[in-house]
Regions:
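A short alpha-helix-loop-beta-strand transition element characteristic
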Residues: 37-58, 88, 102-112, 241-247, ...
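Catalytic cores of eukaryotic secretory-pathway lumenal/extracellular enzymes that build
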Residues: 14, 18-20, 27-37, 197, ...
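Glycine-rich FAD pyrophosphate-binding loop
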Residues: 1-18
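Dinucleotide-binding Rossmann-like beta1-alpha1 core, especially the glycine-rich loop
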Residues: 21-87
Length: 385
């Protein structure tokens, strides 16, 4: 396993504040229906911790008042709209689809902000298909996280692999011929019978990897847009209850959440989507502007804004974004991403057909890659949102 970074995990990266409080710089949430993630944690003895709040239930602020009943009715209207749209959900934008809803303005504003935040792009640049995750969101769930940090499964798997993992070893060249695969890194040359490219989409379509892809596979991968987002961490100075609030003006949500039976994790976390909002809030510089906005959104919380921090991914050379999205009018032939191409197989969350953008998608892609190379190994289980 050749890893360019000095750590395993990629966009699953658990870190700590100076007082030891866990923060998640990347992936964070687990859903009960994510069967492969739940099963993997169970096999590795890694506990899931209930948060006392729902990843799906975010109280909208900043727009027209809207009730829980109105939001529930809006989601029902979305489901009806999807049944009507069919394949047209790939042709029109999220913005256009929301305007078709006969719902209160507050509902439509909340839905647009939610999807722009989660999908990491403006609503005009997202195919209406992205609304499906909101339409199918479960009601009143207590969302779980990995109690010891989102990268715990990665660290556990890395411990099993031991010295077979090579850290800080970026690939600079690679080739495939009749004799196998040759990979040149900054440190050594490696040869193998097959290769699995487990890379984010922006990286796999760049050299030296792009030249290895069949033309139609490169075209399929290139069809996806790249999403951008940032995370915020602000230590809590006082007490708080688990909560989730969506700022509908600025495409971000913030939450306070339990760490299972240990009680509240003493930090307010946030997630902001779409590059225009990241630029507006200057998140690449620091978290000051964002933290000031949070003070208006959550005046009820006592927060240590001087210690606020952010994490961005668009400026990370090994990520260049958070995940992918489908643009209006584009219908990526993504089935090609889940097939074996001679000695080459792709992996990575963006290749999954159900859980793209989630740790579940990454796990499923790895299982699929292993099964494609060795059919005696099980493929991932059937999945649904």
């Amino acid at each position: 396993v050749l890893e360019a970074r000095d750590r395993v995990g990629g966009r699953a990266w658990t870190d700590h504040l100076p007082d030891g409080t866990i923060i998640e710089r990347g992936a964070e949430w687990v859903e009960d229906v994510q069967v492969e993630m739940v099963a993997l944690c169970d096999r590795l003895g890694i506990p899931l911790a209930r948060t006392g709040m729902s990843y799906h239930d975010r109280r909208p602020v900043g727009g027209p008042p809207v009730s829980d009943d109105e939001l529930a009715a809006g989601r029902a209207a979305l489901r009806a709209l999807f049944a009507e749209l069919g394949d047209e959900a790939y042709d029109i934008s999220v913005a256009d689809a929301i305007e078709r809803l006969d719902q209160p303005e507050g509902v439509k504003i909340a839905f647009r902000a939610r999807i722009e935040c989660t999908s990491g792009a403006p609503a005009t640049e997202l195919a209406a298909w992205h609304l499906l995750h909101l339409a199918s969101a479960p009601e009143q769930v207590d969302s779980p996280r990995i109690g010891t940090g989102s990268d715990a499964p990665v660290r556990a798997l890395a411990a099993l692999l031991g010295a077979r993992i090579h850290l800080s070893e970026p690939v600079v060249a690679l080739s495939i011929d009749d004799n196998g695969v040759s990979v040149q890194t900054t440190k050594a040359e490696h040869r193998a019978a097959h290769i699995v490219l487990a890379l984010p989409k922006p990286i796999v379509v760049q050299e030296p990897f792009a030249a290895l892809l069949p033309t139609e596979v490169l075209a399929a991968a290139s069809t996806f847009g790249v999403s951008h987002a940032a995370k915020l961490f602000v230590p809590l100075l006082g007490t708080a209850e688990p909560s989730a609030v969506l700022d509908t003006r600025h495409d971000y949500w913030v939450w306070t959440a339990n760490q299972g039976n240990e009680g509240l994790r003493p930090v307010l976390a946030g997630f902001m989507g779409s590059q225009p909002m990241l630029d507006l809030f200057e998140v690449e510089r620091d978290g000051t502007t964002w933290a000031r906005s949070v003070a208006e959104v959550r005046p009820d919380l006592e927060l240590d804004f001087d210690a606020a921090g952010t994490q961005t991914w668009h400026d990370d050379p090994y990520a260049q974004g958070i995940y992918t999205h489908v643009r209006p009018g584009d219908r990526p032939n993504d089935e090609l991403l889940r097939q074996r191409h001679g000695r080459l197989v792709l992996a990575g969350e963006f290749t999954d057909d159900v859980w793209s953008g989630f740790m579940e998608g990454a796990i499923r892609s790895g299982q699929r890659a292993a099964s494609l190379l060795d059919p005696s190994l099980p493929a991932p289980a059937a999945a649904t949102h």
